Amino acid sequence: MPLRPGRCYRKFSGPAYTRREYIPGIPMPKITKFVMGNVNGDYDYELRLITTEKGQIRHNALEAARVIALKYLSKKLASEQNFALVVTKYPHHVIRENKMMAFAGADRLQDGMRLSFGKPIGTAARLEKLGELVMYVRVKKEHLEAAKEALKIASSKLPIRTKIEISALNKEAAAQ
């Protein structure tokens, strides 16, 4: 069955569904790497991708944002030693779907909304507060514009609105 659009899972209501020991058949999240680049480097600026609304981000959207940001930064900065990219959210919440048949005569084969709890189809990261950090990039001053563009492209892959905040990491960068 094809994947539903992100708008189907953007909003949330009720408590998180996270108790994996009681949930059989949870698919593994697509996102596996959360830290990329040279984390121990000496950088001037930190750019943060911050949410401006509450919502959920599915694991495949997080992975798409990570991949596109990493690809753009690697291409523009020529090496993964020139930046540090960290995804801070993990998809804990298990998403369920009550699969419905959509063909002639399906009403005789299925029960509709009776026993409609649903089966696990994926995971999502819940962002329950405004201003939560999704990912950040650390770069030197000369790579600031490329990092801004990378986060802007990555934010287009996410189902909720975000903004980019820039902060200086050392005193020389703050003075300029």
From Swiss-Prot:
**Organism field:** Sulfolobus acidocaldarius (strain ATCC 33909 / DSM 639 / JCM 8929 / NBRC 15157 / NCIMB 11770)
The molecule here is called: Large ribosomal subunit protein uL16
Give any Pfam family that matches.
Answer: Ribosomal_L16
Any one annotated GO CC term? ribosome
Q: Which keywords has UniProt assigned to this entry?
A: Ribonucleoprotein, Ribosomal protein
> Disulfide bond: present as a keyword of the record?
no
Could you tell me which InterPro entries the record lists for this protein? Ribosomal_uL16, Ribosomal_uL16_arc, Ribosomal_uL16_CS_euk_arc, Ribosomal_uL16_dom, Ribosomal_uL16_euk_arch, Ribosomal_uL16_sf
Entry's Gene Ontology BP terms: translation
This chain is encoded by the gene named rpl10e
For this protein, the record's HAMAP family field holds: Ribosomal_uL16_arch
What GO annotations for molecular function exist for this entry? structural constituent of ribosome
Q: What family is this protein classified in?
A: Belongs to the universal ribosomal protein uL16 family.
Output the NCBIfam families linked to this UniProt entry.
PRK04199.1-1, PRK04199.1-4
